[in-house]
Each structure stands twice: as C-alpha cells, then as structure tokens.
Amino acid sequence: TTYRSDVYNPDSRKPEVQYGDTLEGDLSRRDFTVNAMALRVPDMEFVDPFAGANDLAKGVLRTPVDPRQSFDDDPLRMMRAVRFVAQLGFTIEARTAEAISDMSSRLNIVSAERIRDELQKMLLSERPRKGVEALVDSGLAQYVLPEIPALRLEIDEHHRHKDVFEHTMMVLERAIALETDENGAVPAPDLTLRLAAL
C-alpha cells in the first residue's frame, strides 16, 4: 500500500501530494480520530494510534494532530465536524471546538461547492438543529449562513421569552415533522422544506 503525507500551502486547500512510508503517518492526516483507524491485512492487526475507537465509543470528535494544523491543512474539516454533530450525534472535544471558533474564517479558501455539499448533508441529517446550533456557536455560520446568527439578536415582539433564532429552530423541527406520517418517512428528508424553514 502507498501511504500519503500531503503538504498544504496555507493559501490553498489543494495539497501537494507526497507519499509517506508509514501507516501511522497516513492516519495522522485524517480529519478526526474516529476516521484514523485501520486494519492491517493479511494479519488483521487493528491499528489505532490516536485512540479513535475510544472516541467513537464516546461519540467525541477530536483531530489526530493539533486541531489548528488539521484545520489549516483542510478548513472543510470544520464543516465536517458540524455535519457529524448533526448526522451522528457526536460532540466536539473542547480543544477542537476552540480551534474551529478561532479559525472559522479559513472557510474563505474552500470552494462554495464543497461547503454546499457539507451543509446539505448536515441539513438532511437526523439532527439538523444540532448542526445549525454548532454552526452558530462555532462562528462558522457567519461564513455559510450569515443570516442565521443575527436571529439571536432579534426578539419576537409577540413571544418575548424566545428570540427569533429559537423560533426558527422550532419551525425547522416542525418542518421535519411534516416529512413523516403514520407510515414513516415521506419519502425522504426534504432539503427545500428544511431550507425554507430556516
């Protein structure tokens, strides 16, 4: 097997592909520890240098290397973290969450198409509200859906106990409820409906 150890230019997401010589080095360049495990064949040796199995069992997202280096290499990984919160119900480990907040502006070098793909996957997941909340809390939303964080500043004149953001999240949840009936899902998550709710 050929192992990779890419080198990134800080102003671009496109790596200069280089080949490494160890499986551990290859795994260190993965997005999160839960994706940095391997099975060495034919011996069937489980390789988990970053305790990804433990993080998977706990539902925790952490980067195999320093999160700042990981997100500097590929800023889309920050969006992927938010998607995993929504899709898998994971939580983001504190150091990783702090790096996302500090580096959210790095999304500017990622193509709109790649961001769109992650956003759509997040919105079509089982817990899009959790994903939207993670987008807002991390600061990523200001680069992806800038209208959404501003809703926290607005108070609904009729329901003063909740801000417009909370009402919007309730509308999103109601829209999702419309996707099901007594027979189950009808027929699948509806991206247009969920976007309209936002």
PLM region descriptions:
Residues 1-198:
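Catalytic cores of the polymerase beta-like nucleotidyltransferase superfamily
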